[in-house]
């Protein structure tokens, strides 16, 4: 695609160059010729590559390998926070593109100067150009950022910078999430790994202090990474989910929703992680398919645990010799069985309706019940064991038939006092022992492989146990219906459409949300149990004896009203809230809600929420529901869900695979050995470290080269297509680093040609002295500007990056700069001045076009360009973004010049095909239609061909015996003199 962006006015020139105007080619004809020339050039390039490969295979005779000179060390001379002191581009460290040198010092100056803070109009209100607000997804304070965070920042920051350059009032608000479960999990792992201690070895307040210390360390580390990535966050508004105001918002939300009976307390089946000893929401559970008998590594067990096996056992029917055979994948749960269910219409069991079976281990009788919902007569034996306290389906059966709910597990995964001889055993040890005892009793029938789904904790990989626990819940039904409606109506746009459809489907099938967690790190639930002095036995599982309050005093007033005249004490719930509860308030709590602040007035609803599709339900859904419920407004107008980053082979990034990419390693470069060394700092055990090292050797055999921030950002944006996955190949990042070098050197060349005394015109308007190539480059700049703005608005990052890359590489560098060389050296004084002014204008605009994706190199080179008289713009951050200009559009001149490019490409292809690498002798016999054009632009053609010794225009009497020839433009002929 072409690039876009410019700001100048130029009179349209519809006349053809030279006299006797030739008929301009139609776009269709030109495109056909371009395709033909491009195919030919590609074919010859392929041949040349093949030849080079063959040459490379030949043995080298006594040739020493060329060793690249090391880059000189760059020493920054700028005082931190001050405007960068620009060093000479001819100094050793700056002779070629050096990311370290280019990226140094700019960010601190941008922040200190307030360039990232919202700019308001003279009246203190947002500017008339509009408002753009992103409250960026807060990274967890669990460790360093990974490449997925880099993708998020690259996309969001490109949009923030683009909108800022359009003159809008922009707020790009960043912050951090306390991430209760994730952070506590990683801190506990660290304590165990380094000291063999758990949180229970500390008083709660001491453990929380340890987590705060972790938070401070990683908060600072992550903030530095976010800055290194160029994120133009307004750090004066930085937020943390446990800040005072955000904590106030959490309390307000909980109390308000509890008062409306949307939040309630109930004893229900929950997902229990024995490793963390906390409940998890369904979204925090990873359901893993196993094809059959499988061994899984489970926390707390030295040996792998067997899953994917169906065990058949027999229950003896009381008062007879009959047996009922049932099957289970969890034999240990036999100890919690309180019924055996059969289908009421199953003739095999009709005579057993109302009978009992004898429990083999516990001294109790178990009823045989009829249930046509859970039992399928055609499956297995047609009999099903019912364990209401430990299975979601059985839980419903238990409620329907008023069965006893017997819990068999302790919080840490041992069998409890209800399990007789198995009490105190680990649950999976008990699984084996139960089967052994059944064999001894003659009740074991057999086993077979069974494909199944195993629920695992997303943090610990522990196997989840469904258990009965009193918890706090959110009834989401009405909120979800409202959320679905604003998306269906288009009030909130969600892209891509797949994510929109998934959002609506999820909202229409919403379940209640368990929001309490048995953790110590997080927002403690503002609910208080009312201990009544005259009622020693009170039920804590339901909500009757619980009150909530924004303060302890408010809770006391509620307790007095609920229990008038009673003596009581209040005891605050020790549980904390699910992290996503506070995260769901992010778009408005960060702006001051529940207070009515100026930020809330100016910036809410926000403009865009951009994040990975994987947290659509975790986060986006909850922000929409809570935003509508609490503020009466949508939290944002648009949602864009980007892909998940995978490695070059398409694998999920995982520490144990050794393919996790730290963006700083890509920016700075890192050796393979240093990558290995980093593995030793984490919580991986020795086996996992060796596996990860193997993965690193596969993915990064030579380490990761230094690529710089700009190349990384550009790569990530260029790979963003709206798909589900994004495969990142470090070689591609390295390729865009070379593109940065091209941009850097092109600007260096331009600065050299402009000279130190060059003064740009007061405006970017055309002068009327422009040559054909200048008219063409302005036209292409116009197309690039239009394409860039259109695609950024549509968040089509693939096309936006393609547009600016196309313009820089193939139009500005490969064509205009090459073509302008002869104008700058051999043209008349008027031609030289015009070429310089055009070079300046186009380069200035091209740098601005690239700035949203590559902030550092564009600022570095833009600051070296002179400013127009009267232009006081301090930084490219605040420079006007190029927009389409009618006066730069020149279709006729563009078509003429495309004909010139076609001739050039065809000639280059002929040279490649005939092995002519330099001193080419070229003759062109133009047809009548193109004669004036080719003759007048012969110098341009020769300049663009490169390695062309002479170029002559000939007529039909030319003796071509010594030449190869090729027809172009449907009538013109190129002759290339053969090598002797």
Swiss-Prot record:
Enzyme Commission number(s) of this protein: 6.1.1.9
Gene Ontology CC annotation, any one: cytoplasm
Motif 'HIGH' region positions after renumbering to this chain: 139-149
Single Gene Ontology MF annotation: ATP binding
UniProt subcellular location: Cytoplasm
UniProt catalytic activity: tRNA(Val) + L-valine + ATP = L-valyl-tRNA(Val) + AMP + diphosphate
Family, per entry: Belongs to the class-I aminoacyl-tRNA synthetase family.
UniProt protein name: Valine--tRNA ligase
């Amino acid at each position: 695609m072409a690039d876009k962006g410019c700001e100048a006015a130029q009179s349209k020139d519809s006349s053809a160059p030279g006299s006797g105007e030739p008929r301009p080619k139609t776009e269709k004809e030109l495109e056909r010729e371009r395709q033909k020339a491009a195919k030919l050039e590609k074919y010859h390039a392929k041949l040349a590559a093949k030849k080079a490969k063959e040459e490379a295979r030949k043995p080298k005779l006594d040739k020493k390998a060329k060793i690249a000179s090391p880059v000189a060390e760059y020493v920054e001379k700028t005082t931190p926070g001050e405007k960068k002191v620009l060093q000479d581009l001819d100094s050793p460290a700056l002779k070629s593109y050096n990311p370290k040198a280019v990226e140094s010092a700019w960010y601190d100056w941008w922040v200190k100067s307030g360039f990232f803070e919202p700019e308001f109009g003279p009246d203190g209100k947002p500017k008339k150009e509009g408002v753009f607000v992103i409250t960026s997804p807060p990274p967890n304070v669990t460790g360093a950022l990974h490449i997925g965070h880099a993708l998020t920042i690259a996309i969001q920051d490109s949009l923030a910078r683009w909108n800022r350059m359009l003159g809008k009032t922009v707020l790009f608000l960043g912050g951090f999430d306390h991430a209760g479960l994730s952070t506590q999990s990683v801190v506990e792992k660290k304590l165990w790994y380094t000291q063999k201690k758990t949180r229970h070895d500390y008083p709660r307040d001491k453990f929380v202090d340890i987590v705060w210390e972790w938070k401070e360390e990683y908060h600072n580390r992550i903030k530095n990474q976010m800055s290194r990535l160029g994120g133009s966050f307004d750090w004066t508004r930085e937020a943390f989910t446990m800040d005072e105001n955000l904590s106030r918002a959490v309390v307000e939300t909980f109390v308000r929703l509890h008062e409306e009976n949307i939040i309630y307390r109930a004893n229900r089946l929950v997902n229990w992680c024995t490793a963390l000893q906390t409940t998890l929401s369904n979204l925090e559970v990873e359901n893993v398919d196993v094809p059959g008998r499988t061994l899984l590594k489970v926390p707390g067990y030295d040996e792998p645990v067997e899953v994917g096996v169906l065990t058949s056992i027999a229950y003896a029917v009381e008062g007879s010799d009959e047996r009922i055979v049932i099957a289970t994948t969890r034999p240990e749960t036999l100890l919690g069985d309180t019924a055996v269910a059969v289908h009421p219409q199953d003739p095999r069991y009709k005579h057993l309706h109302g009978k009992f079976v004898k429990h083999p281990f516990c001294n109790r009788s178990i009823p045989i019940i009829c249930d046509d919902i859970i039992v399928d007569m055609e499956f297995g034996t047609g009999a099903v064991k019912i364990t209401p306290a430990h299975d979601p389906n059985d839980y419903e059966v238990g409620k329907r038939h008023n069965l006893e709910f017997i819990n068999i597990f302790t919080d840490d995964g041992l069998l409890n006092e209800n399990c007789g001889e198995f009490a105190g055993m680990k649950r999976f040890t008990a699984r084996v022992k139960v089967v052994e005892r059944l064999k001894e009793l003659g009740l074991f029938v057999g086993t077979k492989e069974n494909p199944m789904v195993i629920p695992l904790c997303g943090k610990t990989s522990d196997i989840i146990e469904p258990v009965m626990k009193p918890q706090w819940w959110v009834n989401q039904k009405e909120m979800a219906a409202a959320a679905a409606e604003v998306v269906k109506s288009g009030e909130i746009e969600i892209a891509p459409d797949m994510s929109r459809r998934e959002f609506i489907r999820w909202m229409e099938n919403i379940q209640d949300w368990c929001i309490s967690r048995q953790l110590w790190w997080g927002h403690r639930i503002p609910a208080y149990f009312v201990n009544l002095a005259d009622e020693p036995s009170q039920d804590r599982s339901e909500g009757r004896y619980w009150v909530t309050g924004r303060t302890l005093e408010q809770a006391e007033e509620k307790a007095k009203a609920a229990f008038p005249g009673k003596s009581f004490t209040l005891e605050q719930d020790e549980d904390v809230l699910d992290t996503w509860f506070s995260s769901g308030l992010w778009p408005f709590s960060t702006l001051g809600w529940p207070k009515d602040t100026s930020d809330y007035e100016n910036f809410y609803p926000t403009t865009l929420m951009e994040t990975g599709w994987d947290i659509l339900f975790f986060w986006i859904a909850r922000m929409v529901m809570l935003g509508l419920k609490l503020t009466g407004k949508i939290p944002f107008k648009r949602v864009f869900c980007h892909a998940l980053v995978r490695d070059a082979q398409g694998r999920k990034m995982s520490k144990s695979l050794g393919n996790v990419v730290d963006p700083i390693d890509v920016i700075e470069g890192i050796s393979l050995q240093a990558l290995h060394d980093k593995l030793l700092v984490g919580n991986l055990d020795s086996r996992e470290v060796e596996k990860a090292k193997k993965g690193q050797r596969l993915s990064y055999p030579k380490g990761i080269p230094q690529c710089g921030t700009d190349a990384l950002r550009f790569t990530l944006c260029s790979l963003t297509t709206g798909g589900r996955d994004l495969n990142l190949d470090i070689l591609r990042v390295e390729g865009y680093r070379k593109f940065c070098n091209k941009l850097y050197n092109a600007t260096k060349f331009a600065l050299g040609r402009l000279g130190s005394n060059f003064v740009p015109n007061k405006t970017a308007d055309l002068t009327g002295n422009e040559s054909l190539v200048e008219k063409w480059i302005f036209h292409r700049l116009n197309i690039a500007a239009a394409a860039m703005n259109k695609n950024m608005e549509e968040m089509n990052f693939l096309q936006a990056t393609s547009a600016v890359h196309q313009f820089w590489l193939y139009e500005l560098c490969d064509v205009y700069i090459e073509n302008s060389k002869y104008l700058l050296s051999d043209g008349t004084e008027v031609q030289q001045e015009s070429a310089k002014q055009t070079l300046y204008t186009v380069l200035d605009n091209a740098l601005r076009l690239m700035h949203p994706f590559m902030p550092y190199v564009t600022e570095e080179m833009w600051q070296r360009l002179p400013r127009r008289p009267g232009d006081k713009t301090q930084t490219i951050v605040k420079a006007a973004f190029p927009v389409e200009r009618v006066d730069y559009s020149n279709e006729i001149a563009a078509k003429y010049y495309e004909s010139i490019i076609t001739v050039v490409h065809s000639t280059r292809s002929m040279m490649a095909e005939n092995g002519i690498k330099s001193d080419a002798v070229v003759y062109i016999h133009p047809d009548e239609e193109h004669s004036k054009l080719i003759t007048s632009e012969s110098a341009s053609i020769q300049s663009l061909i490169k390695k062309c010794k002479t170029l002559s225009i000939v007529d039909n009497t030319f003796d071509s015996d010594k030449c190869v020839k090729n027809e172009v433009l449907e009538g013109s002929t190129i002759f290339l003199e053969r090598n002797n």
